[in-house]
Structure formats: structure tokens, C-alpha cells
Amino acid sequence: MLVDEGLGLYIVADGMGGHAAGEVASAKAVDTVKQHVLANKSVLKDLTKDPTQAHRAAAASLVEVAIQKACAEIYRVANTDSTKRGMGTTFVCLVTAGSRGVIGHVGDSRVYLIRQGQCHRLTEDHTLISAQLKAGTITREQALTSQYRNVITRAVGIQESVQVDTLLVDLVPGDMFILCSDGLHGYLEDDEVVPLVKSASFGDLPKRFINLANERGGKDNITAVVLSINGDSTDEAEETAEASSRMEALKKIPLFRHLTYKEQTAVLSVATTRTFPGGREIVTEGQPGEELYVVIRGRVAIEKNGVELAELRAGGHFGEMGLIDNAPRSATVRASEPTRVMMIARQDLMNLMKRESILAVKMLWSFVQVLSDRLRTTNSELSDARQELAVVQAVAPFSEE
């Protein structure tokens, strides 16, 4: 375990391979990751000052490379010392950089986010049971008694390299992050987390979690790190409101409706925000574009051939077809007043979909549903138009007389 507030690095590592070897593996992982992050602090400074897509990607890469280095080092030690052979560790970390954080994860340790009174799990267990549940080959009831419930499919150090999950998250004042080993979450249901958080002071939470796990069996090492994101009252209100607006707006867009909270967070990690002054064109009719826009605050007018057709307010979105191709925009969208929008670029979304295959399948299925709905609507409108035309043609001869 590591809590380094100066570096903004928080780690939980749960060693495997016997008590002594497991301790070596987890300690080696913590130290290697810390040293790599320390040597590359400039990457985090860049993200803090300017959270561009390039700086976000660099920070995610920093975390992934750090964990890969730890994996290679543990594997090397295990293969030079027969008493350590087969050792490894689960690993989860949160690296903070201003209003952004990067989660790195391998194994079955977890990160929970408590935001606005709700608990969200931001990691997915790398276990055989989790894979079977995802594939639908077992039920949750069967998982509870399965002989394979402790089988891990990924760990740091078992092989020379490992697949690392990374996730970039917003750090909003009032948020609470809980990093823990399976020694805790194995005795704790997700829906119990918020009541426990509300029932204890922040300083007492780790002890409260550990006592609960011990009371319920405590068969494994129990580790928990609790992190609270602070800010002044003004910043807290504004940042919380905007973070909530971004997530709520994303949930309402049909393209993202089947995604989990973790997957929606991944989409938000590739989104950017921008404020347009009143009267400024956001997209221009006839010009190519590749971004989806979501109105976070303010109003926009949709115009075609200089005529206003509609108005969108907070939560409205436009330009989604730009995610599919580079066709010219069919209308101009203009800010009616100072307006803040969230933008998702096609290439950034495609890169995310390449990394997250399940997310990609869900989005493609949603896109097919959207196209199907639009096709039905178009067919219905065409049918109505044909009927109206038939009536006009039938009446026309009599009108001429």
C-alpha cells in the first residue's frame, strides 16, 4: 500500500505466491511504480496545466508503462530466486493531476467512486468468475459457490508483461475514492458502501471497513485506501454541477444509452469542453466536421439557409453523424448566448473503441437502433406524404373545373 499525497499517487497491491513471496511482489510493484511516476512528474504537470487529449494519453501511458515495468521486474526476480518463483500481485492505483486522475488496474483489487451519494465501481475484476458472468455461462448465484471464484486471470509479475486497464477520471470536489483489496470487497456488497461512508467520519473509514471485513470472516489480507477530493465551496459547486451535467447529458444520447457508468466515464475521458460567445457559429452548413456536440450550458440555434429551424438547450446534442463520416454539415449551429459545449471527436472515440471491444459492440448496436428508428420515421413520413399526394391528385381535376 502507498499513500503519497505530494506525488498524488495512491496504491493498493495484494501479493500472491505465499506470504513471504507475496510481500516481496507487492513491495516491488509499489516501489517500481512510484519511482517511474516520480521520474516522469512532468507528464502529470502537463496534464494539470492543460488537459488536452495528447496530455491525457501521455498520463495514461505513464501509468501503464509504470505497471509494465513493475511486472517485468517481479518476473525477473522470481526467475532468479527459486523461493520466489510464481510470485505476483494484484495492483490498483490512482494518480492525481489537478482536476484529473488516472486509474491503473490489474487483478481483482478495486476502485470505487462515491459521487453525489452514489457508489460506482470503476474497475472490472480480472477473474475467471467475472469472465464467465460477462459471457453469460454462469449466474450470479452460481458464482457465489463456484470452486473457481478465487482464480485470477491477470496479475503483475506472473508473466513478463500483462494487460493493464487504465481509466482517466474527473476529480470533482466532494468525490471519494476507495481503493481496496479483495480481502475487503469480498465481504462487502456494492450497495453497502454508501451507507458505511455516511455512518463514519472520513478519518475512521479505513478502520471501519477493515473491522467489517474481519467481523464477516477476514480470511485474507485486508487493505483499503480512502481518498477525498476537496475544494472551496465555489469551485465545488461549479465543478460538481458541470461534471453532473456532462454525465447526465451523455446518458440521454441514444448512442451511449447501453453503456455502464465505467464505460460512460471512459467516453467522457476523450471529451473536451469549450465555451462559445453569443452569436458565434459552432458548426457551419456545408463544412465537413467530425465532432459530436453536447450543450452543457446555454442555448444554440439550428439554422438552414439562414432560417432558424430549432433551438437546443442544456442536454441537447447535434453533429452525431460526424462520428461516422466526414460529410458536410447539413445545418449551421450558432450560440444564442454564451454557451458551453462538450465535444467528442471521431478519431478519439474510435481509438477508445479499439481499446474497449465491449464498449464498441454496445455503441455499434445503439447506432444500428438509431438508424432503424430513423428509417422507420422516414418510411412513415414518406407513406404519409404519398397519401397526401394521392389525395391532391384525386381532387385536382375537380378543382380545375
Which positions does each model-derived feature cover?
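Conserved short histidine dyad/triad with adjacent acidic residue
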Residues: 260, 272-287, 311-314
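Phosphate-/nucleic-acid-contacting segments
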Residues: 385-401
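Short alpha-helix capping/helix-loop boundary micro-motifs
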Residues: 162-165, 288, 305
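A small-molecule sensor/coupling module
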Residues: 264, 349-389
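Cyclic-nucleotide recognition modules
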Residues: 310-365
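PP2C/PPM-type serine/threonine phosphatase catalytic domain
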Residues: 1-276, 296, 327, 368-369, ...
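Glycine- and acidic-residue-biased ligand/ion/polar-headgroup-sensing regions
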Residues: 279, 290-305, 314-316
